[in-house]
């Protein structure tokens, strides 16, 4: 199991006005799903961000600025890596997530 700086990631996300709802492996899920944060295993001081395909451009720009400002205060960086889609799987209580890198 790899060490990932979840505490600092949570601080950055909360400072940007959002709440962590769930973590799974290298992914951090945010309340209302405007973004998914992924730990960068190649650069421990970087967090990769994927925007929900349904997130409006103006909202995405505000979120990006808040995340980058909060990360900089903690000597971290944010890399906007792509978008993601979420869909309910048929017949089961599972969600499928597709990361769509730029």
Q: What residue ranges belong to the model's regions?
A:
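Intrinsically disordered, low-complexity regions
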Residues: 10, 15, 33-36, 60
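Short secondary-structure junctions
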Residues: 15-23, 77-81
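Generic hydrophobic, helix-prone segments enriched in Leu/Val/Ile
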Residues: 12, 37, 66-70
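C-terminal basic regulatory modules in eukaryotic proteins
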Residues: 42-102
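Short amphipathic alpha-helical segments
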Residues: 1-8, 59-63
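Amphipathic alpha-helical segments
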Residues: 4-20, 71
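Ser/Thr-rich, low-complexity intrinsically disordered terminal regions
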Residues: 19-38
């Amino acid at each position: 199991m790899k060490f990932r700086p979840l505490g600092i990631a949570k601080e950055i996300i909360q400072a940007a006005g959002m709440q962590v709802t769930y973590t799974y492996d290298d992914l951090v899920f945010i309340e209302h799903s405007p973004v998914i944060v992924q730990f960068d295993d190649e650069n421990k001081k970087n967090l990769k961000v994927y925007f929900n395909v349904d997130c409006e451009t103006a909202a995405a720009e505000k979120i990006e600025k808040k995340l980058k400002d909060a990360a900089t205060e903690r000597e971290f960086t944010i890399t906007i890596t792509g978008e993601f889609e979420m869909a309910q799987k048929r017949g089961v209580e599972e969600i499928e997530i597709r990361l769509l890198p730029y």
